Amino acid sequence: MDCPKRKQTRLPEFDYSSNGAYFVTFCTQDRRCILSDVDVGEGLAPPAVCLSAIGQCVEQEIHAVTKRYESVRIDNYVIMPNHVHLIASICEQTGGASPSPTLADIIRVIKSVSSHRCPELKWQRSYYEHVIRSERDYLEIWNYIDGNPGKWADDKYYIEA
């Protein structure tokens, strides 16, 4: 029996350990809303993301990955009910023999350690990534991440509870 081939989502011949910024989205399995709740607020109050215990675990691992890999920064992120958006930057190594991690290494660590710590957390296979190629692109993505909670009901990952 022939298995369907997965669509290749990565850029061929691109070095995902090279210096640069990357926009990444990864989802919970079956898009289960277990990471947070979004309170859209009333009147002029800004929306607030209230992390669940599982979401707090994911947030801890987002911060921990920058300690594990000195060349990695997480510039901005938001933990939505069933997915995470983040900007990961890989910077030049400042010595040492170990190579820079790839983007896949970074996301693998966040997903595997958080699901190990919270066994009820299961992640969807793979992730979406976009190579950020300009300051304008970077700022648009930054604003998208910051504005995402306010647009939760219109989000393509939205599932009504």
Question: What name fits each language-model region?
Answer:
Residues 1-161:
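Short catalytic/metal-binding and nucleic-acid-binding patches
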